[in-house]
């Protein structure tokens, strides 16, 4: 089980990303727009850099929703590989079967 502080930190990051998503998208659109003046694009870049670091979605880490494990997490289920195995063997994930060929 991951430390509760690490799990809460990730939750806080997710809220920050959601809060600044629209503003980041607008600024990035201005920066990418070649028809805008260089000064305007430069100001947009400065504003983007002034946003909090945790507003960037790249800083988020996928964690297991049960254990908080940061590695080996499947996006489709939101669970770590070990927990997927346990739950799948109990038959609690519909449509998931053990591979055999």
Swiss-Prot record:
Gene3D superfamilies: 1.10.287.1480. Part of the 30S ribosomal subunit. Contacts proteins S3 and S10. GO terms for cellular component: cytoplasm; small ribosomal subunit. Keywords: Ribonucleoprotein, Ribosomal protein, RNA-binding, rRNA-binding. It comes from the Bacteria. It holds the Pfam family Ribosomal_S14. Binds 16S rRNA, required for the assembly of 30S particles and may also be responsible for determining the conformation of the 16S rRNA at the A site. GO terms for molecular function: rRNA binding; structural constituent of ribosome. It comes from Polynucleobacter asymbioticus (strain DSM 18221 / CIP 109841 / QLW-P1DMWA-1) (Polynucleobacter necessarius subsp. asymbioticus). One of its GO terms (biological process) is translation. This is Small ribosomal subunit protein uS14. InterPro entries: Ribosomal_uS14, Ribosomal_uS14_bac/plastid. Belongs to the universal ribosomal protein uS14 family. NCBIfam families: PRK08881.1.
């Amino acid at each position: 089980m991951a430390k509760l502080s690490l799990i809460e930190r990730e939750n806080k990051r997710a809220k920050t990303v959601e809060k600044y998503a629209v503003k980041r998208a607008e600024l990035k659109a201005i920066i990418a727009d070649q028809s805008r003046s260089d000064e305007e694009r430069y100001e947009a870049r400065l504003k983007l850099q002034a946003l909090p670091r945790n507003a960037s979605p790249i800083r988020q880490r996928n964690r297991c929703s049960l254990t908080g494990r940061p590695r080996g997490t499947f996006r489709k289920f939101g669970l770590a590989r070990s927990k997927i195995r346990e739950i799948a063997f109990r038959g609690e994930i519909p449509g998931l079967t053990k591979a055999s060929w």
